[in-house]
């Protein structure tokens, strides 16, 4: 702007789309962000991989992509699975959509004791929280992937002598 004239940029995403084609999901994927997750001992810092989408009506050209980031930055308390409904409602209201999808995937760490020696160690569990809104109904799912170790009878027997923790 070299000549002191006020320039008005067009708001393309809010303009009408004459093609009249609805899009089921528009949004962001592959976001890695630090989050604070509620735990039995208070809260735990971790890093989440995030996907966030909204449905786009046939008469719209786009959505405000920066609002996804703003919504993530607005989570300022320890996150719990129950909050997925609240985050979904905020996203739909902010982006003026009637359908959406949110996915958070993160590692969660817990202290565990060895069965014989009772030594403490940290185990990581992969957690995936999803929320989906379709036909006015919000569905939340939680998936936890827990490592499993089996112990053969021979190993169990020699663990009494300190062979395994």
Model-based region annotation:
Residues 2-165:
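N-terminal intrinsically disordered, cationic/polar leader segments
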